[in-house]
From Swiss-Prot:
Belongs to the ATPase A chain family. This is ATP synthase subunit a, chloroplastic. Pfam families: ATP-synt_A. It is a multi-pass membrane protein. The chain crosses the membrane at residues 38-58, 96-116, 135-155, 200-220, 221-241. One of its GO terms (molecular function) is proton-transporting ATP synthase activity, rotational mechanism. PANTHER family: ATP SYNTHASE SUBUNIT A, CHLOROPLASTIC. Key component of the proton channel; it plays a direct role in the translocation of protons across the membrane. NCBIfam families: ATP_synt_6_or_A. It comes from Cryptomeria japonica. GO terms for cellular component: chloroplast thylakoid membrane; plasma membrane; proton-transporting ATP synthase complex. It comes from the Eukaryota. Keywords: ATP synthesis, CF(0), Chloroplast, Hydrogen ion transport, Ion transport, Membrane, Plastid, Thylakoid, Transmembrane, Transmembrane helix, Transport.
Length: 248
């Protein structure tokens, strides 16, 4: 009974985490729900940038790629190699779109927060920021990753997937269950904490010292933002590969 209660308590904990707020926020009231408008607006902008860039890059495909098409193919090869390394040569193919979507959305979101002056867009309450600056976004991305590796393991190994929870001994059942629920927790907090801290440091420096001084910190933030996107995508692919590795 306690073992069954633990996942329920963890889900309740994630629900409480999703209500964490830093600063003021702008909400839309849709029916009986409050929707976090800041996250939706900036997420839609990031999605539009990604879709627009991809459309422009492939609107006139060439046999010998150049310009935007060449860059897009380089990104695709990078994501494909990442998925192949973490998931395995035989199984990585179907997961390239998922890993690529995660990587590109997080990467562009992080850089949007570091490069775009969101403060010039005025809202009734609060201000716009990178989507990954909000824990609701990072928790959602982490939960999607959890669903993905549960799905990968179950479809590959069937009911035998759940046998991993009692290996190497049934005594470790609670710990193995805890491990699966802490994976999305660590993913979400790592991404949220790094992006929020970077934006706060830059904001404080800009308010205290001339604009030239924070520039090195801003460049460091760009580097950190890219690394965080890579870490998230790498861990997501590694979790998916791990969930399927007991098949052979």
């Amino acid at each position: 009974m306690d073992i069954l209660q633990f996942p329920i308590n963890m889900l309740n904990y994630f629900y409480e985490i999703s209500g964490v707020e830093v600063g003021q926020h702008f909400y839309w009231q849709i029916g009986g729900f409050q929707v976090h408008a800041q996250v939706l607006i900036t997420s839609w902008i990031v999605i539009a940038v990604l879709l627009g860039s991809a459309t422009l890059a492939v609107r006139d495909p060439q046999i010998i790629p150049n310009g935007a098409q060449n860059f897009l193919e380089y990104v695709l090869e990078f994501v494909r190699d990442l998925a192949r390394t973490q998931i395995g040569e035989e199984e990585y193919g179907p997961w390239v779109p998922f890993i690529g979507t995660m990587f590109l959305f997080i990467f562009v979101s992080n850089w949007a927060g570091a490069l775009f002056p969101w403060g010039i867009i005025k809202l009734p309450h609060g201000e716009l920021a990178a989507p990954t600056n909000d824990i609701n976004t990072t928790v959602a991305l982490a939960l999607l990753t959890s669903v993905a590796y549960f799905y990968a393991g179950f479809t590959k190994r069937g009911l035998g997937y759940f046998g991993k929870y009692i290996q190497p001994t049934p005594i470790l059942l609670p710990i193995n269950i805890l491990e699966d629920f802490t994976k999305p927790l660590s993913l979400s907090f790592r991404l949220f904490g790094n992006i929020l801290a970077d934006e706060l440091v830059v904001a404080v420096l800009v308010s205290l010292v001339p604009i030239v001084v924070p520039i090195p910190v801003m460049f460091l933030g760009l580097f950190t933002s890219g690394i965080q996107a890579l870490i998230f995508a790498t861990l997501a692919a590694a979790y998916i590969g791990e969930s399927m590795e007991g098949h052979h």
